[in-house]
Structures are given as C-alpha cells and as structure tokens.
Amino acid sequence: MLIVKPVQDKSEQERYCAECMTGFEPDALCYAAFVDDELVGICQFRLMAGGAHIIDLCRAKGTDDLDALFIMGRQTMNFIDLHGVHECCFDESAVAELSVDFAKKLGFIERGGKLWVDLNGFFNSPCEHGKAGSPR
C-alpha cells in the first residue's frame, strides 16, 4: 500500500535524503513516500512569497516507483496550493533527478527557462489538465 506522509522530524528527513542520495535541506518541508513500509522517495520543497520551489522529487536508491513519485508530487502541489501559494517552480536539481517530461506530466510548463505551474484552480477541475496532468 502506498503511503505519502509529511516528515516533521529533521533527523528522519536527513536519513531519508541519504537513502535517496540527495542533499538534506534543513529549512525545507518534506514528504516521504512508502510502499509496503519501504521508502520509495522523498519530496523537499519550500513555500516562498514569489512561489513555491520543489527542490527534490527523487527515488530511494534501488527503487523505481514513478507512480508513487507522481502521487507524492501532486500531493505536494496540492499542499502548496492549499497554503495560499499558487505558483510553483520545479528546481533544476529536481528536473535532473527525473526528467522534464515527468515534470510536464505533473502539470509544469516551461516558462522563462524554468518549469512552472499555476496552481490557481488546478485541483478544482483535474480533467482540465488532460491525462496525468499534460495539457490537452
């Protein structure tokens, strides 16, 4: 069973980052995804006045569950939107781990050399974003 949960303990977040071979960002918020109690990935992100930044959306070493990462990415985006931040950037480090195509499936588009998503109404009409978030 897939479980995506917020990571509130910073030492736990640091351990999960090590398991995902990514840098620990102590001032970032974090979600972790587990399948049958096994860590499959994490998402570190920041809420900022000019928009949120997804710093990392990455797999744990030895795992390849892209469905879990997709769900965790969308959960992160929903959290960001619900907290009043309606623009979100997919940082270059996050893109390097996955791919531009994966970010676009989440709903991001290229704008000004970066990947952005406008979350205004994004979760009100999910069908509006096409299959797996890609524009129609």
Residue ranges and their predicted role:
Residues D27-L29:
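Short loop/turn microsegments at loop-to-beta-strand junctions
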Residues D64-D81:
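Conserved acetyl-CoA-binding loop-helix of GNAT-fold acetyltransferases
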Residues L106-R136:
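C-terminal "cap" of GNAT-fold acetyltransferases
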Residues H86:
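Short acidic/polar active-site loop segments enriched in Thr and Asp
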Residues C89-V100:
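Conserved beta-strand-loop-alpha-helix junction that forms the acyl-donor binding cleft
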Residues A32-D67:
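Conserved donor-binding loop and adjoining core beta-sheet/short helix segment
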Residues L98-F108:
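Short, aromatic/basic amphipathic alpha-helical patches
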Residues M1-E25, P126-R136:
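Short amphipathic alpha-helix that is part of the acyltransferase structural core
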